């Protein structure tokens, strides 16, 4: 039985990629794309998120990095492109989310960020798995 499960291992990483990629794109979308489209200031959503990050005592520019890591990192994870790099960025982002954001609530609600952190670590350590562009270009 373990041999047949080992054959399915690349597909486990594929499904983790799907979950993490969709979650990160969903979470990052509102931080990158302004509500109502790009009328006026294209950076208004990023600025809003950066102000929130700065209110936590972190550098303002880290808000830009955080939002782009979520949105673009989610796209990369979903495609299986530069998976380990994107997983590293997302893992760092989730670690900051657990440490800085959820601490104001007694860490209540940190389970979601913790689960995404663990999925990102799995992809960082084990790679993209099946159906990944990394395999096609030799990054696997």
Each model region followed by its residue ranges:
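Extended, low-polarity transmembrane helix blocks
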Residues: 1-38, 51-54, 60-68, 72, ...
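Extracytoplasmic catalytic/substrate-binding loops of multi-pass membrane glycan-assembly enzymes
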Residues: 41-44
């Amino acid at each position: 039985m373990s041999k047949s499960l080992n054959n399915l291992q690349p597909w486990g990483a594929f499904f983790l990629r799907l979950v993490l990629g969709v979650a990160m794109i969903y979470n990052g979308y509102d931080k990158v794309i302004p509500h109502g489209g790009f009328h006026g200031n294209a950076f208004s959503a990023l600025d809003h998120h950066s102000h929130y990050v700065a209110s936590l005592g972190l550098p303002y520019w880290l808000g830009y990095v955080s939002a782009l890591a979520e949105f673009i990192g989610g796209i990369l994870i979903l495609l299986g492109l530069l998976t380990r790099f994107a997983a590293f960025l997302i893992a760092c982002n989730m670690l900051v989310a657990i440490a800085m954001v959820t601490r104001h609530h007694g860490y209540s609600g940190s389970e979601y960020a913790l689960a995404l952190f663990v999925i990102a670590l799995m992809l960082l350590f084990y790679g993209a798995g099946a159906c990944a562009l990394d395999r096609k270009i030799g990054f696997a």
